């Protein structure tokens, strides 16, 4: 991953401070940071929501299996917002913070856990639809 070269950069104000966060992004993709990547297809543009998968129920035996964010070991959660098969925006949030928002919204009954996904599969996936603005809402940032 290319790094900013302090000798050729004209952005020298707060360069040392910014270098810490540049390294954080490098670590996220190259080193000790783990990142789960999810892509939201076109529908996010119409609804303004992202889907956060939580679990699935198998139709043959009604067994519940936790999936998605509930079992992820990733430190970061990447949400690629795709339109016409092209990534238009990327939102990156700490996995534990996004899971915390899901739990908070469920406790407050603000957004419901609902069935989502392919109806013809052997299981039904459940998750929460969260408006994108909620992720960026200042009061939700811990």
What are these regions (language model features)?
Residues 42-70:
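Mg2+/Mn2+-dependent nuclease catalytic core
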Residues 3, 7-16, 64, 80-142:
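Non-catalytic C-terminal interaction segments of nucleic acid-processing enzymes
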Residues 45, 70-72, 85-86, 106:
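A generic structural signal for short, non-catalytic loop/turn and secondary-structure boundary residues
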Residues 16-34:
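N-terminal domain-onset segments
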């Amino acid at each position: 991953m290319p790094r900013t070269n302090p000798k050729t950069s004209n952005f020298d104000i707060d360069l040392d401070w910014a270098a810490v966060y540049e390294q954080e992004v490098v670590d996220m993709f190259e080193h000790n940071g783990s990142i789960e990547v999810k892509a939201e297809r076109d529908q996010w543009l119409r609804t303004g929501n992202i889907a956060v998968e939580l679990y699935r129920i198998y139709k043959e035996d009604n067994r519940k299996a936790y999936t998605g964010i509930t079992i992820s070991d990733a430190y970061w959660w990447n949400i690629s917002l795709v339109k016409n098969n092209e990534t238009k925006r990327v939102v990156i949030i700490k996995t534990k913070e996004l899971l915390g928002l899901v739990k908070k919204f469920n406790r407050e009954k603000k957004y419901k856990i609902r069935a989502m996904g392919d109806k013809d599969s052997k299981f039904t996936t459940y998750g929460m639809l969260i408006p994108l603005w909620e992720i960026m809402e200042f009061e939700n940032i811990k």
